């Protein structure tokens, strides 16, 4: 079974892909990373930074998670990310996404030993 840490990498890490202006990026990536198999995942964020940099966020700024848990961490620097949002006229299995490039801090939930990201909680405009 896929571990939470591996699932996080599959769903959110695209270190090789530089943030692309390709409008089809999300359509292609959501499919190739298996997020459109049983249904169209409505929203997903890809992070275009080295895995080690994303894992390091677990030791940065501790913040509360959206669900109230206390194991979330905000990156102390901006990261290049791509937000994928399902378009309103999408019908499974034809999942169509809007691709938007951003530079923001990311918030991830971490657990385990080694302590690694297992859930992407949010992205926020970096605090200046």
Swiss-Prot record:
GO terms for molecular function: lyase activity; nucleic acid binding; ribonuclease A activity. One of its GO terms (cellular component) is extracellular region. It comes from the Eukaryota. It is an enzyme of class 4 (lyase). The keyword ATP-binding does not apply. Residues 1-25 are annotated as: Disordered. The active site is at 12 (proton acceptor), 119 (proton donor). Endonuclease that catalyzes the cleavage of RNA on the 3' side of pyrimidine nucleotides. Acts on single-stranded and double-stranded RNA. Substrate binds at residues 7, 10, 41-45, 66, 85. Monomer. Interacts with and forms tight 1:1 complexes with RNH1. Dimerization of two such complexes may occur. Interaction with RNH1 inhibits this protein. Residues 14-25 have a biased composition (Polar residues). Keywords: Disulfide bond, Endonuclease, Glycoprotein, Hydrolase, Lyase, Nuclease, Secreted. This is Ribonuclease pancreatic. The keyword Disulfide bond applies. It catalyses: an [RNA] containing cytidine + H2O = an [RNA]-3'-cytidine-3'-phosphate + a 5'-hydroxy-ribonucleotide-3'-[RNA]; an [RNA] containing uridine + H2O = an [RNA]-3'-uridine-3'-phosphate + a 5'-hydroxy-ribonucleotide-3'-[RNA]. Its main location: secreted. Glycans are attached at residue 34. CDD domains: RNase_A_canonical. PROSITE patterns: RNASE_PANCREATIC. It is found in: Secreted. Pancreas. One of its GO terms (biological process) is defense response to Gram-positive bacterium. Its EC number is 4.6.1.18. Belongs to the pancreatic ribonuclease family. Disulfide bonds join 26-84, 40-95, 58-110, 65-72. The lineage of its organism: Eukaryota, Metazoa, Chordata, Craniata, Vertebrata.
